[in-house]
């Protein structure tokens, strides 16, 4: 690890006698794929973003307790997320366990104190020798910063970036917070319509007509869909549509995520065509998925024709509404063959819950997680017909009687 910033310190208790490898294995195993590869602990260690996990353990009276230290050079938000992930571990081996965060030590704090004290000394000496006017310096710095601040555009005083007048291209977003976040990463040719009120400001309509390229950059939720509908109904010139990841908002994206979303923008006509396809019957999606599987797995014609009953199944409207709410919740929903709710569970518990269900009780599983080989095989043994997840993991062999889709297949990108 090249630069240590923080040390995550936790304590734990286990209702049984365990060893250090058991604790470390539980941490790796139960945090795997919670937030995708980006926050996989092993990968973070390989990249030098996390250090070696230190475990001290004491077994007494058939129980174990101890503490854990995890060095981190991630930022504050990412480090807090790692701490929360480790706290979510509930079992070590077959025994119930409880992990609790005690503190996140900022190892740079002492160094920062010394730097601040030294800076005070330098400033005192400098002021004494040069008679420096600090206010003058601060005003100069403040003036430079203001060039990247928000401006107000049009008679509606809409939040906008400073290049909204001069840049030949334009990015339209929903609100003020989106503009601020884009400015943070250097995107200054922006204007906000301020919410899905059903009425787009006329100044945005006129502004779009004079731009070479106009991008609607919207949240990855139903609110983003509403904004796009309002823009189209108001005859705003839109050339491309870019969306934040499903369930995410533009205001919370990192610079890397913003760049990726904008690079994935597609022409408006193509986007609308995709939307129409996404609201078509689920049967057509499953049929398409079956055709792809036929080519990928070189299935025989007889195997493709067998799930005819499954292909005809459609997702009811009320279930579609539940699906749209799933992204970002880390929850899963299990339905029976008539789309009646069987149970709502946390993603981390979905394997255990499915194992305990009677065969035939679960026909459809929709969850905010990764579809894995283990889940797929268990679902096949429980006669599950359809699984919908955030994404599909490394699947080596797909059971013929289970169809798999992503949330994007069902509710659009």
UniProtKB/Swiss-Prot annotation:
Domain Toprim as annotated: residue spans: 168-246
Listed GO MF terms: DNA-directed RNA polymerase activity; metal ion binding; poly(A) binding
Pfam family, one: Toprim_4
Classification via InterPro entries: DnaG_primase, Primase_DnaG_arc, TOPRIM_DnaG/twinkle, TOPRIM_dom
Catalytic activity: ssDNA + n NTP = ssDNA/pppN(pN)n-1 hybrid + (n-1) diphosphate
Enzyme nomenclature, EC number: 2.7.7.101
Binding residues annotated for Mg(2+) 1, in chain numbering: 174, 219
Keywords linked to the UniProt accession: DNA replication, DNA-directed RNA polymerase, Exosome, Magnesium, Metal-binding, Nucleotidyltransferase, Primosome, Transcription, Transferase
Cofactor binding note from Swiss-Prot or TrEMBL: Binds two Mg(2+) per subunit.
Source superkingdom: Archaea
Gene Ontology cellular-component annotations: cytoplasm; DNA-directed RNA polymerase complex; exosome (RNase complex); primosome complex
SMART domains: TOPRIM
Alphabetical GO biological process terms: DNA replication, synthesis of primer
Cited CDD domains: TOPRIM_primases (cd01029)
HAMAP family per UniProt: DNA_primase_DnaG_arc
Family to which the UniProt record says this protein belongs: Belongs to the archaeal DnaG primase family.
Function: RNA polymerase that catalyzes the synthesis of short RNA molecules used as primers for DNA polymerase during DNA replication. Also part of the exosome, which is a complex involved in RNA degradation. Acts as a poly(A)-binding protein that enhances the interaction between heteromeric, adenine-rich transcripts and the exosome.
Protein name, UniProt field: DNA primase DnaG
Species name: Metallosphaera sedula (strain ATCC 51363 / DSM 5348 / JCM 9185 / NBRC 15509 / TH2)
Gene encoding the protein: dnaG
């Amino acid at each position: 690890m090249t630069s240590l910033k923080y040390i995550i310190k936790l304590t734990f208790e286990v209702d049984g006698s365990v060893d250090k490898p058991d604790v470390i294995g539980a941490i790796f195993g139960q945090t795997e794929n919670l937030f995708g590869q980006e926050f996989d602990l092993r990968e973070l260690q390989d990249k030098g973003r996390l250090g070696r996990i230190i475990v001290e353990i004491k077994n007494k009276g058939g129980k174990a307790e101890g503490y854990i230290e995890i060095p981190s050079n991630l930022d504050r938000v990412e480090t807090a997320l790692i701490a929360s992930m480790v706290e979510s571990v509930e079992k070590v081996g077959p025994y119930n366990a409880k992990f609790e965060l005690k503190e996140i030590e900022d190892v740079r704090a002492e160094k920062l104190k010394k730097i601040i004290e030294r800076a005070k000394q330098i400033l005192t000496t400098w002021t004494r020798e040069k008679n420096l006017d600090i206010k003058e310096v601060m005003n100069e710095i403040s003036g430079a910063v203001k060039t990247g601040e928000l401006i107000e555009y049009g008679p509606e005083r809409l939040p906008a970036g400073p290049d909204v007048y001069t840049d030949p291209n334009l990015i339209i977003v929903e609100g003020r917070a989106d503009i601020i976040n884009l400015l943070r990463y250097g995107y200054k040719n922006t204007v906000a319509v301020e919410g899905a009120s059903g009425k787009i400001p006329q100044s945005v309509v006129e502004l779009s007509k004079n731009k070479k390229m106009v991008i609607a950059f919207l949240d990855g939720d139903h609110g983003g869909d509403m904004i796009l509908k309002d823009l189209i109904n108001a005859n705003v010139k839109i050339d491309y549509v870019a969306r934040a990841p499903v369930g995410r908002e533009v205001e919370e994206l990192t610079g890397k995520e913003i760049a990726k979303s904008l690079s994935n923008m597609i022409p408006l006509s193509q986007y609308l065509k995709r939307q129409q396809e996404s609201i078509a019957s689920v049967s057509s999606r499953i049929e398409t998925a079956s055709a792809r599987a036929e080519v990928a797995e070189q299935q025989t014609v007889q195997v493709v024709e067998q799930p005819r009953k499954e292909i005809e199944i459609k997702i009811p409207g009320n279930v579609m509404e539940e699906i749209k709410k799933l992204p970002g919740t880390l929850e899963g929903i299990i339905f029976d063959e008539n789309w009646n709710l069987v149970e709502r569970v946390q993603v981390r518990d979905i394997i255990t819950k499915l194992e305990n269900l009677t065969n035939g009780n679960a026909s459809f599983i929709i969850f905010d997680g990764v579809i894995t080989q283990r889940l797929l095989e268990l679902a096949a043994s429980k006669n599950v017909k359809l699984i919908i997840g955030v994404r599909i993991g490394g699947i080596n062999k797909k059971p013929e009687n289970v169809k798999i889709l992503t949330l994007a297949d069902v509710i659009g990108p």
